[in-house]
């Protein structure tokens, strides 16, 4: 049986892929990060699941402003637990 979280990850990844292939094609490329935010979302969803993937993506989007220099911002290898702070 397929888990609900797997289905949600698939659906979100599908919609982001539609955005990447059909909608962003008509918009000028101005992403200041590598990988792009849409690719970052797909990677974080696949690696950490729905909740943590969305949180990581939102935190990434908060960095997207003119005062941030951008550059390489990869999905973390692991997320720190509260006990590691």
From Swiss-Prot:
It is found in: Cell membrane. It is a peripheral membrane protein. GO terms for cellular component: plasma membrane. The keyword Cytoplasm does not apply. Its main location: membrane. Belongs to the UPF0161 family. The keyword Ribosomal protein does not apply. InterPro entries: Membr_insert_effic_factor_YidD. Could be involved in insertion of integral membrane proteins into the membrane. This is Putative membrane protein insertion efficiency factor. Keywords: Cell membrane, Membrane.
């Amino acid at each position: 049986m397929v888990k609900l979280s797997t289905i949600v990850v698939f659906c979100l990844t599908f919609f982001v892929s539609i955005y990447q292939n059909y909608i962003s094609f008509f918009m000028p490329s101005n992403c200041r990060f590598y990988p792009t935010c849409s690719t970052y979302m797909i990677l974080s969803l696949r690696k950490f699941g729905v909740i943590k993937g969305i949180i990581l993506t939102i935190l990434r989007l908060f960095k997207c402003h003119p005062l941030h220099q951008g550059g390489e911002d990869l999905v973390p290898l692991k997320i720190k637990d509260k006990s590691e702070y």
